[in-house]
Amino acid sequence: MNRRLDNERVIRAPHGSDISAKSWLTEAPLRMLMNNLDPDVAEKPSELIVYGGIGRAARDWDSFDRIVASLRKLEADQTLVVQSGKPVGIFRTHPDAPRVLIANSNIVPHWATLDHFNALDRMGLMMYGQMTAGSWIYIGSQGIVQGTYETFVEVGRRHYHGDLAGKWILTAGLGGMGGAQPLAATMAGASMLAVECQPSRIEMRLRTGYLDRQAASLDEALALMAEAAVTKQAVSVGLLGNAAEIFPELVRRGVRPDIVTDQTSAHDPINGYLPKGWTLAEWEMKRASDPKAVEQASKTSMVGHVQAMLDFHAMGIPTLDYGNNIRQMAKDMGLANAFDFPGFVPAYIRPLFCRGIGPFRWAALSGDPEDIYKTDAKVKELLPDNKHLHNWLDMARQRIKFQGLPARICWVGLGDRHRLGLAFNEMVARGEVKAPIVIGRDHLDSGSVASPNRETEAMKDGSDAVSDWPLLNALLNCASGATWVSLHHGGGVGIGYSQHAGMVIVADGTPDAARRLERVLWNDPATGVMRHADAGYEDAIACADVNGLDLPSLAR
């Protein structure tokens, strides 16, 4: 019996103001857990897989049921402890403590290998939580679309005089994260050719409005890119195929995209990357019968994929790793110069992290889109001079279809997050929205992750692999009163390559919530400024000074 498979279940978060838990502070994690498994949100909900290879919301269906039952009976001064997707304890704490504490996929460093994780996973002792899958704050592809948009805009600013009209981006991967790329590209004014090996993923991105159309062949896809370059009308095109075959073929043909990147699930060479020349059926069968053969074939295929990206880079085309660890996989197989093209964080995003700016997100627990539109307006009211952000919110309302509970992603930083959280809480208190608002973020944030091949690649002081920072972030968020806090390993780049922390806090309209929101939404981004200031980044040191952060080691 497969305890992780149930084809009969359809999970959706409840909507409205009636709750089945004892308070909104426990109803919120309950709804967000269920929302992660909504068929409009999750990649494989019948297997509890939300996104990112095998990123799960719960370890198995029995654990899911026990989590739900535990949340429904949890008292206002109790905390539920969840170990890799299984509820293991309920303890008396206090009303300002987190209602849920989550640890996912954490392994003692010497044993933190994919092989050892897979053995524990098969034994039913662990699950892979990715970043927001096992921490119950995934909001569909919107969760990464603004970060991807900001990256593409910055590439355009640096390399194309700030104008991506008539330019096109080559990428691969249309899963839960990669599926944001086509919409982010067209929002930024560029066209995109996205290669994807699974038809269901192309269909989902077409259905949810993230992808404009599908090409029947590579020739048709290239013709559409050429036409868009002339008309300067941005279009996103999905192509069914294998990136390990398509990328090298484009190099052979002498095709020159304007930007090259990749968001296949290369971090998981067994479950996330189709080997060159294999069918989906063969891949699925061999994942169960001979996973080591799949891993070897996948990583061998990645060498050709990365070599093609290196070839584009050598042509002078802006080429960037988008954080899936594909360079490391290729280097492991002998491609010595795999890291010759940069990751997106050190190349384009780190200046934002130095100011504590990152992927702030919120969801309307009512299920009513109007609640999100009202919060959009509140963001504009409180940040009247941020025209770039206003433009983003306008585009998001027009072009992003909600998946599951209505939600919004909005990159803001220290000094603004707590103001927005307090304003949302006041809206709940005054009845301007129909139910509380849940506020969280990706683990990909300025102070909550250690990932030497992604968020902390090429740190100024060489502290790329120091993982004290996400641990301190999680501890501080617990002390500050976040509603649930998570500490994960392996998200984004795979087992052995990252540690990261998440937090979620509920704005339920009460004065107690206001006090928690003010603490959490100040301290959380402040840890990012602290981390980068400690590494010697002048922008972060200046931000700390302006905001009055007390950083003893940097006292002047």
Swiss-Prot record:
Q: How would you classify this enzyme at the top EC level? A: lyase
Q: Which InterPro entries match?
A: Urocanase, Urocanase-like, Urocanase_C, Urocanase_central_sf, Urocanase_CS, Urocanase_N, Urocanase_Rossmann-like, Urocanase_sf
Biological process GO terms, please?
L-histidine catabolic process to glutamate and formamide; L-histidine catabolic process to glutamate and formate
Q: Which reaction does it catalyse?
A: 4-imidazolone-5-propanoate = trans-urocanate + H2O
- What's in the GO CC field? cytoplasm
Entry cofactors = NAD(+)
Active site: residue positions: C410
Return the EC number.
4.2.1.49
* Amino acids binding NAD(+): 52-53, 130, 176-178, 196, 201, 242-243, 263-267, 273-274, 322, 492
Q: Which family does it belong to?
A: Belongs to the urocanase family.
Q: What is this protein called?
A: Urocanate hydratase
From which source organism is this entry?
Bradyrhizobium sp. (strain BTAi1 / ATCC BAA-1182)
